[in-house]
Amino acid sequence: MLRRSLFFTGLYCALLNLAPIGISDANAAADDVLKAENKQSAPLSILPLWKRILEDYAFEGSIEPSQKYRAWKKFIASIENDPPIRQLLKVNLWFNGFPYKQDNWIYGEEDHWATPSEFLENGGDCEDYVIIKYLTLRRLGFPAKDMKIAMVYDVFSGTDHALLVVDLDGENYILDNRDNMTVAAHYTK
C-alpha cells in the first residue's frame, strides 16, 4: 500500500472531458491529502500539448503499428474483461515497467508530452505515464469524466509530479509511476 506522504502545495486537476471540476476545500481536515482550493478547469482545447497528443494519437491508429504498439493493444485486449479495479492495478503496474526518462534526455526539450508511440518506444516522465494510462483506460471504457490529471508538488523530492486520479464507484484511486500499487486516495496519508 502506498504509505509515502505527498504534501501538496498546490493541486490543479483537469477533467479530460472538458467539464468544470471541483476539488475539496483547502480547509479540509489536516490528514486529507487532496487539499486544494476549488478550481475550474479550462477547456483542454486551449492546451497545445494536449491537442498535439490527441491529433498524433488519432494519426497513430492509421499507420502500421510498431511491435511495442501491438504489444500495448494486446495488453489492453488481455484485460478488457477484468473487473475495473483489476484493470486499474494492471494498467498502473504494466506501464510502470517502462523506463522513466526526463524530456530533455529523450527530446532535448524541457517539456514534451509523449504520444503513446513515443512513450512505448522511449519511456517518459510522469506526464507521459499519466497520458498513456489515461488513453489506455479510455480504450477500456473508463469515462473521461471519471479521470483527472493531478499536478502536485512533492516536498520530499522537491519536484512537480503528475498523477492520474480515477473515480471508480465513488472512490478516487491514484495511479502513480513512482508506486506500483493503485490505492484509494484516502489511504495516501
Regions inferred by a protein language model and the residue ranges of each:
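N-terminal export leaders
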Residues: R3-F7
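Bacterial N-terminal signal peptides
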Residues: T9-P20
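A structural boundary/capping signal
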Residues: G22-K189
